[in-house]
Amino acid sequence: MINTTDYAFDVERYRDEADAISFAGNLGMDGFELLPCEGGRDDFFTERSVVGVHLRYFDSWLDFWNGKLEMLSKEYGSFEKVKEIFGGLDRSCILKRFREDLERARKLKARYVVFHVSDVSARELFTYQCRHTDEEVIDAAAELINLLLDGENYTFDFLMENLWWPGLTMTRPEMTKRLLSQVHYQKKGIMLDTGHLMHMNLELKTQDEAVDYILEKVAEHGNLASYIKGMHLNQSITGAYVKTLITKKDAMPSDYEACSKACYEHVFQIDQHLPFTTPKVQKLVETIKPKYLTHELMSYGRSEHEIKLVMQRAALKGKNV
């Protein structure tokens, strides 16, 4: 699959859905993993092209979930901004947002959906000093997921994605087990994001080292690795950038809008979503054997996206790129 949003920036790459389907098919792809956006073109992608749906997410949501609105007011600058971001001031607002996405996934006949299990504030992004633990995020995420899925007749796989912030990181098998054991939904699984896992090791210098590291962490999971049903395939070797970032703790803007912009820029400096170009990535995919493989790459246009997809596809065939 190819990752996409329904925002104009992505949709305008194609004349229409038929053109998007042709683009994917010519590259040997089965379709798209769609991330719906506020203000997106919700009429552009249909069940003809969508294989999976990536649920929308809140980077910093745990304090909101736990009713600690004062903390969020400090994070976002005002209660009005909190209300604007979450759609209100109580849990039902988060549940409403996710239920809308789940219903859309149902209508699109998506085979899987993706859910982030993570929490990070703007300050934590700059400092890498986090207030919440993996346990706290995982327990709250499991509670939220069960409220969303219990009693529903969804048919898709529900895949929980690792990130490099508190929550599911895929570096602590006991935490992966803690999450899976609490989620009731039978068709649950993991969406392994290779780039996100790479960010857990700031010492990685090459793609080959990264492949070895990912395989090592997967092996540590033993039988739990069978829950890895999906993979977001991409790479970013940005440990040096992060080491520099966390030494500049006073560089974070105090104004919310300026801070939000800076966070956005930093995240994409860290998580670059570049294609693998080492043939060793073939071993990674063949070892894990994901049911769903999404080439989750970042680009600024159709031609650039095609070039990057071709590069990663070639590496997967064992070619040096």
Regions found by a protein language model. Give the residues of each.
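N-terminal pre-domain/capping segments
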Residues: 1-100, 319-321
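Hydrophobic faces of well-ordered beta-strands that scaffold small-molecule active sites
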Residues: 1-9, 30-34, 49-55, 113-115, ...
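Acidic-and-aromatic substrate-binding clefts and catalytic sites of carbohydrate-active enzymes
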Residues: 10-17, 28-44, 58-63, 92, ...
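Generic structural signal for well-ordered alpha-helices
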Residues: 21, 40-45, 98-105, 142-149, ...
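Short low-complexity, flexible loop/linker segments enriched in glycine and/or proline
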Residues: 48-49, 128-130, 309-310
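Aromatic- and acidic-residue-enriched segments that line the glycan-binding/catalytic groove
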Residues: 62-73, 128-132, 246-252
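Active-site acidic/histidine proton-transfer and metal-coordination neighborhood
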Residues: 87-189
